[in-house]
Design a protein with these regions (language model features):
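Zn-dependent metallo-beta-lactamase
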Residues: 1-19, 26-29, 96, 103, ...
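Pre-active-site segment of Zn-dependent metallo-hydrolases
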Residues: 12-51, 56-60, 74, 110-116, ...
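Active-site neighborhood of phospho(di)ester-bond hydrolases with catalytic His/Asp-centered motifs
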Residues: 22-23, 42-50, 70-73, 135-140, ...
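Active-site environment of divalent metal-dependent phosphoester hydrolases
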Residues: 28-29, 51-56, 76-79, 93-96, ...
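Glycine/small-residue-rich loop that forms an oxyanion/phosphate-binding "nest" at active or ligand-binding sites
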Residues: 56-113
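A short acidic, amphipathic alpha-helical/loop segment
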Residues: 57-64, 82, 148-149, 173-177, ...
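Binuclear metal-ion centers of metallo-dependent hydrolases, dominated by the metallo-beta-lactamase
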Residues: 68, 80-93, 175, 179-226
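Active-site-proximal loop/helix segments of hydrolase catalytic cores
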Residues: 114-123, 128-179
Length: 226
């Protein structure tokens, strides 16, 4: 599996014959200006919630690539009114897609569209096929609900967790979250995009190391194989 960091909470993940893109915030992000949106070619676009820094490029990527959007009911309805094809999930629900299974799980955050309208409750995704399982937490606080993931899903090979604090949990809480989800390999997201979420990267790595976990911090545009 190849994972490319698109900046902020955005990732391009290649699973066998399908490409998934999560929370694309590329074109408005000056830190991601070296990424050409036309070269991001998803089969599926997965959106954890409706905030602009998570859905900014969802409409264009979906239409340009005839990609299916997957998110909560309200996000899919909002995008559907713009001509985007989608499939709605809600909390605790899972669905088989061409790439494997997607389960929409709880997150503690807020969610509204850029125009201020209600975007439903935010969530995260657990994704798996017959070879690998991973969790993209979206924007969330540390929550005991995370302990349900090992009880209801296959064992995680890695997880993508927000670590930037202020708007989500910080790296100290994210390291505890790694314990809750029983996952030794964490990819950090939602950090250093804006001033309020600027963190000390070495301290973040140390917080995970102290709990026997690995924190992977990718540069925007960089990839990793798992």
């Amino acid at each position: 599996m190849k994972i490319r960091f698109l900046g902020h909470s955005g990732f391009e993940i290649k699973m066998k014959n399908h490409t998934l893109v999560f929370d694309p915030y590329i074109s408005p992000n000056e830190l991601a200006s070296h990424i050409n949106l036309s070269e991001v070619q998803p089969d599926f676009v997965l959106l954890t919630h409706g905030h602009g820094d998570h859905i900014a490029d969802a409409e264009q990527l979906s239409k340009d690539n005839d990609a299916l959007c997957i998110s909560n009911y309200e996000v899919i309805n909002w995008l559907g009114a713009k001509g985007v094809k989608g499939h709605p999930l809600n909390h605790g629900g899972k669905k088989e897609f061409a790439f494997g299974t997607a389960k929409y799980v709880n997150a503690i955050h807020t969610s509204s569209f850029p125009d201020g309208t209600y975007a439903g409750n935010p969530g995260g995704f657990v994704i798996w096929d017959d070879e690998i399982c991973f969790y993209h937490a979206g924007d969330t606080a540390l929550t005991l609900d995370m302990k349900l993931i090992p009880l209801t899903c296959p064992k995680l090979d890695f997880a993508i967790l927000p670590i930037g604090d202020n708007f989500t949990m910080g790296y100290e809480d994210a390291a505890i979250a790694a314990d809750y989800i029983d996952c030794p390999k964490i990819i950090g997201c939602h950090f250093n995009t804006f001033a309020p979420i600027t963190i000390d990267l070495e301290k973040a790595k140390e917080a995970f190391k102290n709990r026997g976990k690995e924190l992977i911090l990718l540069e925007i545009g960089d990839s990793i194989e798992i």
